[in-house]
Design a protein with these regions (language model features):
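Generic beta-strand/beta-sheet core signal
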Residues: 9, 18, 27-29, 36, ...
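Active-site phosphate/pyrophosphate-binding segments
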Residues: 104-108, 112-133, 219-330
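Conserved short alpha-helical segments that host acidic/polar catalytic motifs at enzyme active sites
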Residues: 1-90, 94, 103, 109-110, ...
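Glycine-rich phosphate-binding loops that contact phosphosugars or nucleotide phosphates
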Residues: 124-264, 298, 328
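A residue-level signal for conserved active-site and pocket-lining positions in enzyme catalytic cores
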Residues: 6, 21, 58, 101, ...
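Beta-sheet entry/capping signal
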Residues: 5, 14-15, 32, 57, ...
Length: 330
């Protein structure tokens, strides 16, 4: 019962590990094996990983490993992680979040270079659904809210809801619907729990290759943002939005037009970051010591307001709220 990932080590170096409802990855290199909650800690040593399933017990001895589940030998797939180890370092920046903010022009471009077949399959799943439900937690829930607006503009019946709330009424989701599940890590517990009782097909938008969500989904689109070390999500958020916008725009026009439009957006992100460094310092100085900060937005700007408010709370512990522009006067 419960959620756990446990590693036991003997003096001889022999190890055993098992998991239930918590992520555990086995990194595989020549003569070396690694255990971690995700792949980032061992990226500098190997780009090969096995993602353990619930009930798996892995035993490591003399540079070899075996996996059992319910007493039976299991042969789990070895995944290739297409991340550069340098991406998991600060590369001269003061902190990871600064680095990841500045990576956004590149990560948005990577996010929109999806295989045509993957985009077409996602659109087909959406078109065949009676209702499309977008769901995530925290930052990913705001990406879901914004993505829902993009898909509504393309003419689809779409509802967005935070996963921990959707779990209370997911019995209304039928096999004729579609759930688009959004998560940077692919290990968000509330999201995975909600999906357990859903009969509808699942399209996942996720960053971490081989994660639990990616394995359980009927179809997955990776945002290709690389490792996000900063606790407060930045580049994963914009990459999630880029993929959702790519789907919606492709449905209305073509993949080529949608991709070119978003590549142009990536260029504008780069200009915005370069042109506003001094203003960022000025606003930061002004916010220091403030007790309350309110973010106001209309339309798609409301999702930006919600995410901005969350970022301020996460990083500064300053009280912050967000409101739609029309609601603020009430």
């Amino acid at each position: 019962e419960g959620s756990y990932a446990v590693v036991a080590v003997k003096d001889s170096g022999e190890m055993a590990a098992f998991k239930e409802s918590s992520p555990l990855a086995l990194g595989i290199s020549d003569g070396e094996l690694f255990l971690a909650s995700d792949v980032t800690p061992f990226l500098e040593h190997t780009d090969k990983a096995v993602f353990l399933e619930d009930g798996d017990v892995v035993r490591i001895e003399d540079g070899n490993y075996t996996i059992k589940n319910d007493g039976e030998d299991i042969d789990r797939e070895v995944n290739h992680i297409d991340w550069d180890a340098e991406e998991a370092s600060k590369e001269g920046h003061d902190h990871f979040m600064q680095k990841e903010i500045k990576e956004q022009p590149d990560t948005v471009k990577r996010a929109v270079f999806q295989d045509k077949s993957d985009v077409e399959k996602a659109i087909k799943m959406i078109e065949e659904a009676d209702t499309v439900y977008l769901s995530g937690c925290g930052t990913s829930s705001y990406a879901a809210d914004l993505g829902a607006k993009y898909l509504r503009e393309a003419g689809y019946d779409v509802i967005s809801e935070q996963s921990h709330e959707m779990e209370y009424w997911n019995n209304h989701v039928t096999e004729d619907d579609l759930v688009i599940a959004i998560s940077q890590s692919g290990e968000t517990a509330d999201l995975l729990s909600m999906l357990e009782d859903v009969d509808a097909p699942v399209l996942s938008i996720v960053n971490v290759v081989g994660s639990t969500l990616a394995r359980k989904a009927d179809h997955t689109m990776y945002i290709n943002a690389g490792p996000e070390i900063g606790v407060a999500s930045t580049k994963a958020f914009t990459a999630q939005i880029a993929v959702l916008k790519l789907i919606g725009e492709t449905a209305e026009t073509s993949l080529k037009e949608a991709r070119n439009s978003l590549i142009n957006t990536a260029g504008k992100i780069e200009e915005t970051l370069e042109d506003n460094e001094e203003m960022v310092e000025e606003v930061s100085d002004y916010l220091q010591g403030q007790e309350h900060v309110y973010f106001i937005g209309r339309g798609k700007g409301f999702e930006v307001a919600k995410e901005s408010s969350l970022k301020l709370k996460e990083l500064s512990y300053i009280h912050s709220e967000s409101f739609p522009g029309g609601e603020f006067k009430h």
